[in-house]
């Protein structure tokens, strides 16, 4: 729904999934307020008028802009659902773009028309749960060669690519100056830029991939002394970035 088509006082029929979430998960009753979103920036503040029928009345609404400094997760395919866990948590944290990656050591395989549907459902569900107004953009699955191209484009556009690797010598603290500089530049000129976080599969990123990404301009760093799972490394890095960018205020 377009914000131009809305007015305060209008009554809306909630989609069945939203109605179930409001009644069963949130335990809302008639007269309780709730927030709705179309996943494209429109946020609606409403009051539930008929919980059983899913009827809500619009109180106010507005369009929320996307952040100037965008966060993207390049997540390698991982077995036993670790990749889906990663994008779920990343969405709750505030990731703006998700790029599936068929890494050299990925055991799981991307199945067009099936895996992308599952990932999209995860993103939409996490968006709804976290009350976000924007659903993260889901890109097509990329190969390692295409990730190299992403790194090269990032260098040209003034973006940043951070590769998480357990054997890296550079620490996250050493990247913070560059992160702050990129954020300040975005605020000054208003031109959107993206910070990409790249996470490998269970078997890690191959030496050949690390070398190729580094030559293409990516920063390779380690997140502390503990080895993180494929499901947690990305969300941890995104949390640090969100805090550095002032999203956690």
Residue ranges and their predicted role:
Residues 1-64:
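N-terminal positively charged helical leader segments and presequences
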Residues 29, 43, 66-70, 93, ...:
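Short connector loops at helix/strand junctions that flank enzyme active sites
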Residues 65-163:
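RNA substrate-binding interface of SAM-dependent RNA methyltransferases
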Residues 207-249:
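Structured adenosyl-cofactor binding patch, chiefly the S-adenosyl-L-methionine
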């Amino acid at each position: 729904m377009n914000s131009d088509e809305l007015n305060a006082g209008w009554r809306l029929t909630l989609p069945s999934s939203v109605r179930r979430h409001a009644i069963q998960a949130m335990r809302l009753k008639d007269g309780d307020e709730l927030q709705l979103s179309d996943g494209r920036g429109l946020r609606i503040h409403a009051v539930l008028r008929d919980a059983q029928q899913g009827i809500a009345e619009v109180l106010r609404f507005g369009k929320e802009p996307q952040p100037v400094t965008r966060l993207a997760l390049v997540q390698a395919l991982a077995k036993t659902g670790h990749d889906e866990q990663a994008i779920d948590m990343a969405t709750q944290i505030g990731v703006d773009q998700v790029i599936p990656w068929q890494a050299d050591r990925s055991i799981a395989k991307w199945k067009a028309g099936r895996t992308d549907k599952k990932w999209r459902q995860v993103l939409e569900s996490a968006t709804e749960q976290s009350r976000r107004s924007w659903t993260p953009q889901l890109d097509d699955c990329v190969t390692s060669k295409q990730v190299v191209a992403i790194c090269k484009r990032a260098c040209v556009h003034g973006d940043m690519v951070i590769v998480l690797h357990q054997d890296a010598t550079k620490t996250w603290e050493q990247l913070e100056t560059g992160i702050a500089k990129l954020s300040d530049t975005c605020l000054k000129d208003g031109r959107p830029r993206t910070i990409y976080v790249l996470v490998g599969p269970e078997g890690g990123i191959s030496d050949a991939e690390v070398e190729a990404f580094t030559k293409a301009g990516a920063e390779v760093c380690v997140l502390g002394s503990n080895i993180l799972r494929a499901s947690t490394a990305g969300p941890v890095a995104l949390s640090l970035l969100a805090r550095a960018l002032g999203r956690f205020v």
